[in-house]
Each structure stands twice: as C-alpha cells, then as structure tokens.
C-alpha cells in the first residue's frame, strides 16, 4: 500500500545500479518499492510505469481528457518488473509547424502545453525531441533537457543555430562571401547547448527550408557536383566545431529533399559514424517529397549503405505540393 491513508504504506526507494543498461530499470515490490536504475531516465521511466500500471494514468491522459479519480491507497502484490529493451537508441518526436501550440496557454502558462507534450513522450518511452521549429526550438530546448530528453534539430537548422537572415538582417546568406558569419552562428549554438544531451544535426540548406542555392547569387553552385562538395565540406567543419566543446558527440544528418538526391547520386560524403536519417514523403512512402513542380521521388531506403541509420516519419505533413 502507498498513499495518504492510515494503512501502513510502502516507501519508494531509488537505488543507483551501474550494472543495468542505460535508461533501463528494475522495480522490486516487497515491503517497500525499490527502483534500481543506472541513470536519470531509467528512474523516470520506472516512476511513469508505476503511474500507469498502478494508478491507471494513461500515457495520453492529458490529451484524452482522462478523468482521474483520487485514491486513498493502492494495493500492490509483491513482484518484480523489468524494463523492456528499446530496439532504437534515439526515439522521439519532432514538433513542427506547431501553430496550434504557439499561443495556447493553460492557466495562463504558455509552457504547460509543451510540458505536457514532453511528459507524454516520456510516458511513451521516448528519449529525444526536436522541441519546436525556429524560435520555439530555442524557447523550449532547456525545458526538454531538464525533463531528461535528448535534443536534436530541424533539418534546416544546422546544429540548432539561429537562422542567418534573422541574425544578420539585410545581409545576403552567401556562404562563399560570409562563411565566418555562418561559423559564428554555429559555434554560438554549440556553446549554448554543450551541457545538454544533444544529437547534433549537421546540414546546410537555404533560408526557410529550401535548397541553399536558392538563396545564393554567386552562380558558383550550378552543378550537383559543386553543391555536394560544399555540403560535404560544411558537414566536416560543423563536426570540428562541435568537437571543440563536446566530448564524444553524437551526430546525425537528415537526407531530406534535395540532400537525398545529391547523396544518392554520390555527390555528398558522410562518415559512417554520422547517423543518416532518411525521410518518407509525407504519405508513408520512403521516397523524397515533392516540392513545387519538382517530383524526383528518389528512394530513401538504404541500399548497401553502411553506418548508423535513422528514420524521419511524418504524421501530419503531405509534401510541399499538397501543402501549397
């Protein structure tokens, strides 16, 4: 029994056990409840397991308007509960095009909807999030990290940095002429996040989620070879910037849209240690999404592709033709 009743109740003890795998837990229920875990997320998952199994709090309780009844006590049989082993190391949600979240307040608190979203992710066994797009990602980043989540970034936001056009208003986003300004943006972003758990997104795309050559007026990137070479060199530079501040960093790159097309044709070089994240087209088909009048439909499934792999699967996006 545990609760606020007059019955003799259990205490919940937390026991750090370095022999357990990361994020795993063991719950021993006897005279007391002993939760063993190797790290913070292991303890979080265990407490949420108790919440669901014995207090009947559903993972989506907030979003489903679950009516929660107060209980004086809960009786639990003696048992042992061991955590399931996740098949994917980094698992999470990307909160994108989040217009319905941006002005929502709960009891006057703009942070509470995001807090509930991150809690739900944890209750579902997730451990990573892109905590919004553009400004929202930076507003919500620390809260997500404080709740134990890994942070990663929008595929058009290298290392989670500020958008060039906002950081340098009136300055053309021309990498060949303004490379030092880009480097400063990226370095500032790394310094800002270096104390969080981050899967660092490596990329170079244009302003506002488009190919970088759409914003470039130099005329130097008129072939896929030139475009791929620049992106490859920038990815290496971004890795070097992160390694200045972070020990054993985790890297990913999103092979999305025009980036997948260049990669498939062999124009972009990516080290095997970088997680290559492949995307569906918005309809569940693993091909590149359509944009404007461009319908390449390049397969995004790995073919003899070495190294670490990931998937970016859309739930409420239907490509950039239907979206228009």
Q: Where do the PLM segments sit?
A:
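An acidic- and aromatic-residue-enriched active-site/binding cleft used to recognize and process polar
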Residues: 38-40, 98, 126, 133-136, ...
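Contiguous, structured surface segment used for ligand recognition
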Residues: 1-85
